[in-house]
Amino acid sequence: MLSGAKQVMGFFNTIFACIINNAFYIIILLLPFILFIIFNKKINFEKLKLKTILYYIGSIIISFTFALFIINSDKNSKDIYSKYNLYNNVYYPTYSAKTFGIVKTFSLDIYRYFINFEDKIIINDVFNEINNDSNYNVTNINFDDLINNEKDYDIIKMHEYFKNKEPSLKNKYTGIFKDKNLIFITGESVNINAIKKDITPTLYMLTHNGFVFNNFYTPIYYASTSDGEYTNLTGLLPTEGTWSMIKSSNNNMKYSLPAMFKTNDYKTYAYHNNTYNFYNRDITYPNLGFEKYTACGNGLEKKINCNIWPESDLEMFNETYNDYKNDDKFLAYYMTVSTHLNYKTTNNDIVKKNINLVKDLDYSSNVLGFISTHIELDKALENLIKNLKKDNLLDDTVIVLLADHFPYGLSKNELEELNKDIKYDNNLIHKNFLVIYNSTLKEPIIVDNYSSNIDVLPTLYNLFGFNYDSRLLIGNDILSNDDGMVIFNDRSFITKDTKYNALNDKTNDKKNLVYDKYLYSRLILEKDYYKYIK
């Protein structure tokens, strides 16, 4: 009970700090209401004359007719985000607000809510069908039989799409980690610019050895950490307007990280050093395929101090290692919390613990606090590697580490303070690191392909030599010959050749591909599509 109260207070302090920091904008938002209260007695409402009423009605009819004419003027446009498609077929509030305005987008959302609107499946370019060639990461799925025996229109169209979607080729890295263990870590807000060789040496070693990804991003999506985890663990893009991870809790998730490892005879564990049922993890984790889930409130509080905020990653790693070390093959997943905002000593126990270790660095107090939280994770990883080495498990264990999202607890100026060589824009702010490390890789393998967290699962499945169908995941194997793409929550994207801003740039050949990735990610979630795959 005390543990839960402490955690709630930690989040309350964070929320309160955000309110204080944005007080000016909140006042501006409330200003019309405040002025109305002050001056309402001085406002006179006169009864309208019939002529004036008719004038207003006529103006509304003319405006409405003109709007319909404009919307239908590009009905035959091939642009997936044409005004006609945005109004009738496509759910894309960010771009709708830019096209129609906020008020119209809001009213359209209300209307669609009551009619249970769903995106229409708009067929884009179709790939050539790929046979079950052994050079591809595909499985023997008979899509023709599935199509012939299905009556649901959307499911049929999904079968057709995935049947003809181009799979990834196997490559020289296929199966190099076969039968090795995996420790997969989603690090709360961890960031490459907080990693210093002399301050966080283990993190520095991990990010500069194994596979080194120079153009990896961790975009933030609609539900922050929950969506970051969803993407990391499923290889799917989150769906706007819903809690994707929670919604998936009743679905067949047989292609998720734990489900795939479980299918390949691994014991699967999940750990989180915060409240066990936050974001409904006590429901979503088992459904994903984790056989044992331990967090504060369902057992971890007996092993670590769950009465501080945020809790210690070091304690969690130290006290859970023995759970899985003796298994033949294991997947251990950690969702950390020590690097959680905010980063002031007044209400962050990890900052209080480690701040003296960074006090001589030339940064502002908030940035120093952020760096100090990474020390806790660094020590956790240092001890983990020592334990693996002591038990002769290091060579047989792969360590994966990536963030859930960028550290939005820091301002843009504070982020630029961390890396003075970069002026951040809305996309570059998400550039980060991906660790895929195994001690048998003696030299760093440099990867320049553009990628993000939706690409991690297909990359790992190929490295571990799993029999999987790459067409059914939205991301791509980063180590394949496919051109990589980083997709952001407003449907902007970056490739090696292109930097596309969805709200400002008019056309790009790849924006239909981005539309497809969002559409089919949503349909997989909403239709529980994987249950149809035999």
Label the predicted regions.
Residues K83-F184, S189-Y204:
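Membrane/wall-proximal cationic-aromatic binding patches
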Residues Y153-K534:
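Solvent-exposed soluble domains appended to multi-pass membrane proteins
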Residues M1-Y136, Y529:
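Transmembrane and membrane-interface helices of multi-pass
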Residues S3-K6, I141, E150-Y153, S451, ...:
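Short coil/turn linker and secondary-structure boundary residues
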